[in-house]
Design a protein with these regions (language model features):
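Short amphipathic alpha-helix with an adjacent loop that forms part of the alpha/beta core around
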Residues: 201-211
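C-terminal hydrophobic helical "lid"/dimerization subdomain
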Residues: 2-4, 275-330
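NAD(P)H dinucleotide-binding glycine-rich loop of Rossmann-like/cofactor-binding domains
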Residues: 50, 61, 89-154, 187
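Glycine-rich phosphate-binding loop and adjacent beta-alpha segment
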Residues: 176, 224-296, 329-330
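Short, glycine/polar-rich helix-capping loops at beta-to-alpha or helix-loop-helix junctions
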Residues: 98-101, 176-184, 201, 249-254
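Mid-domain Rossmann-like dinucleotide-binding core that forms the NAD(H)/NADP(H) cofactor-binding site
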Residues: 85, 123-198
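Glycine-rich beta-strand-centered segment in the early N-terminal region that forms part
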Residues: 26-44, 55-97
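Short glycine-centered segments of the SAM/dcSAM-binding site in methyltransferase folds
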Residues: 89, 147, 171, 237-238, ...
């Protein structure tokens, strides 16, 4: 029986991790084409931290409860939903509400939990797999044998990009901020790991590619990295900007972009229409989900926290010492 109330984590007011607190909230009702999921685990992502700080508010009409990805069991169907069925174990991309015992999700944004994964492993798939697939493979068209440069290789996005890049037979170069993180990236499959604190990633990338440069660059830094990415890119290279952790503004000489015929794309995931995210989910199910069985794909989980200690999970994320994903157990 589904209760009327649930435990959820809310942001008391914008601020430090201790602004997160566990409260009682009504269990949400699924609208048409939505499902209600009893959450077993929820992934923690950088946008959650930005929302807590007050600089990345949820889209209009979305719950103020943070959390963009979950895994659990479908326990109620909205009108018009035929798949997933009641009782199905799913992971889902949500626009908010993941830090709770129950969450609603558009049915088209739900994916079955791969048979080889636990619910907590499945909970950390949606945000990074949707992001990497959409930006690296759809928008940037990474091909077999090409070189992918990934900034922040030890992050959740970065480790996912390594896994998928290698699964689709690309050469993967990453940047990371310590010898330990570089070693972890190589162990995961990265061909080259560059410690950006000890050397210039542009020079290292060109050296690793015999002067050609990277065909696709996945950048979550922004700022002055945009011009440096252009220098590290190959002719006809594609640069995908997905975050601006290093700054929102950049100054660059446009001539190298034209001479190299570069393509720069930029996107966020959360505000995209449900139809777009449903299409990405369908593409993942067709192209990536089989790889959990055939290639043994598994996400990298650094740490697990109880839902009541979401603040601890945020403190770990802000320390930048984690490798891979952080998960809340509900």
């Amino acid at each position: 029986m589904i209760p009327q109330t649930m435990t959820a984590v809310e942001i008391r007011e914008p601020g430090p991790p201790q602004a997160l607190r566990a409260v009682e909230r009504p269990v949400p009702e699924p609208a048409p084409f939505e499902v209600l999921i009893q959450v077993a685990a929820a992934g923690v992502n950088r946008p959650d931290v930005l929302q807590r700080k007050g600089v990345y508010p949820p889209p209009a009409g979305v719950t103020d409860i943070p959390g963009l990805e979950v895994a659990g069991e479908v326990v109620r169907l909205g009108e018009g939903v035929y798949e997933p069925a009641l009782g199905t174990r799913v992971c889902a991309l949500v626009a908010g509400g993941g830090y709770a015992q129950y969450v609603i999700a558009p049915a088209v944004q739900c994916l079955p939990v791969p048979a080889s994964l636990t619910l907590e492993q499945a909970a950390v798939l949606p945000e990074t797999f949707f992001t990497v697939w959409h930006n690296v493979f759809e928008r940037s068209r990474l091909q077999k044998g090409e070189t992918l440069l990934v900034h922040g290789g030890s992050s959740g996005i970065g480790t996912t990009a390594i896994l998928l890049g290698k699964a689709f037979d690309a050469r993967v170069i990453v940047t990371a901020g310590s010898a330990q993180k570089c070693a972890a990236c190589r162990e995961l499959g990265a061909d080259v790991a560059i410690n950006y604190r000890e050397g210039d990633f542009v020079e290292a990338t060109l050296r690793a590619t015999d002067g050609k440069g990277a065909d696709v660059i996945l950048d979550m830094v922004g700022g002055d990295y945009l011009a440096r990415n252009a220098a590290a890119a190959a002719v006809e290279g594609r640069i995908a900007l997905i975050a601006t952790q290093g700054g929102n503004k950049s100054e660059l000489d446009l001539r190298p972009l034209m001479m190299k015929r570069l393509t720069i794309s930029a996107s966020t995931l959360r505000a995209q229409p449900i139809a777009n995210k449903g299409r990405i989910a369908a593409a993942l199910r067709e192209n990536v989900w089989p790889l959990f069985e055939t290639r043994g794909l598994k996400p990298v989980i650094h740490a697990r926290f109880p839902l009541a200690d979401a603040a601890g999970a945020h403190r770990l994320m802000e320390s930048d010492t984690h490798i891979g994903k952080i998960v809340l157990l509900v």
